[in-house]
Amino acid sequence: MSYIITTLGNLVHQSAFFGLTWGNYLMVLVAFVFLYLAIKKGYEPLLLVPISFGMLLVNLYPDIMLAIEDSSNGVGGLLHYFYLLDEWSILPSLIFLGVGAMTDFGPLIANPASFLLGAAAQFGIFAAYLMAILMGFPDKAAAAISIIGGADGPTSIFLAGKLGQTKYMGPIAVAAYSYMSLVPIIQPPIMKLLTTKKEREVKMEQLRPVSKLEKILFPIVVTVVVVLILPTTAPLVGMLMLGNLFKESGVVKQLAETASNALMYIVVIILGTSVGATTSAEAFFNFDTLKIVALGLIAFAFGTAAGVLFGKIMCLVTHGKVNPLIGSAGVSAVPMAARVSQKVGSEADPSNFLLMHAMGPNVAGVIGTAVAAGTFMAMFGVM
């Protein structure tokens, strides 16, 4: 009888109820909110479901992220091994491979001026870098945090790993992916504030057709030019363009389909759950995390505003041929930011179709954010 009582007592004491803190329970509630937003509201479920479930797991059972060196038997927690792939920058690069295989660069090729809008939206990154330094973050940490302004989760994780800022990787990744998911909420008020109804009603001419040869040459030329100028961009830009070459060449359909479907979804599952698992209460509830979340929001808002303002300049220069709304799509949240440009434009004029025009700056923003990350790596001598 005493054996049974002792056994039951051990089982009760080994349950999560005795090992969790108030912070863990609070993070569990945050995970529930994220799951609600993903499942009920449909806010980027492919990202938020695995992230929020990883958040849930690590706060119910912290040892699921136990490092190998901290374990008594030399075996780490399951999600720790997933996380190592983030830390080594493997998963972010594979995400870029999949994104490349899914992306049509035709709108950018048809309207090369879109590169300027994609570049303008990167202003938020460098503004956040300066603000992070002013708020007391070290140079490398400030650089890793600032990439949130590009609304690009994989690049944020990639740069944090390359610059050795794994301490901040969890908050950075969660902030970046959260803002990617909340693009439809954050961007419209800024876009409407900075434009007039007349500007939002501007109709743009149909883009010219892009030949197959142009689409094949584009990833090759971009890789050669960008990597020659900034070699540190090779992992991200190289994988992005390789995936796109798979798609556009037409001779490796199996590789293109695998990269854009099976491989992409497997990587998203592993990346999402491991990113969510970095949000333990101990790691997340501190003043630095609050500053990172605030800086990320400011950077994203600045990037959106810079894109719209540059779009207004282009509208003026072209005598009303460019709708400023497409400038907000210069952040690299593909294709969410382009859809937001379309939505805000159609609210002003239901017959206005901006989606394909907005896709140009949108895909340019993906390249721009990767270049910004490569620039920071070059600044700090990291290869």
Please annotate each region the language model reported.
Residues M1-G74:
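N-terminal alpha-helical transmembrane segments of multi-pass membrane transport
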Residues A175-V251:
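Membrane-embedded hairpin module used as a gating/binding unit in multi-pass transport
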Residues M1-G19, Y25, S71, V75, ...:
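Intrinsically disordered, low-complexity non-transmembrane regions of multi-pass membrane transporters
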Residues F34, L57, L85-I109, G243-F246, ...:
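Hydrophobic transmembrane alpha-helices of secondary-active transporters
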Residues T223-G307:
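Transmembrane helical segments that form the transport core of multi-pass membrane transport proteins
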Residues L108-Y129, S280-G307, A358-N362:
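Entry/N-cap segments of selected transmembrane alpha helices
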Residues I39-L48, A67, Y81-F82, M102-L117, ...:
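Interfacial helix-loop-helix linkers and transmembrane-helix boundary segments
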Residues W88, F96-M102, L117-A127, M131, ...:
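Alpha-helical membrane segments and immediately flanking helix-loop junctions
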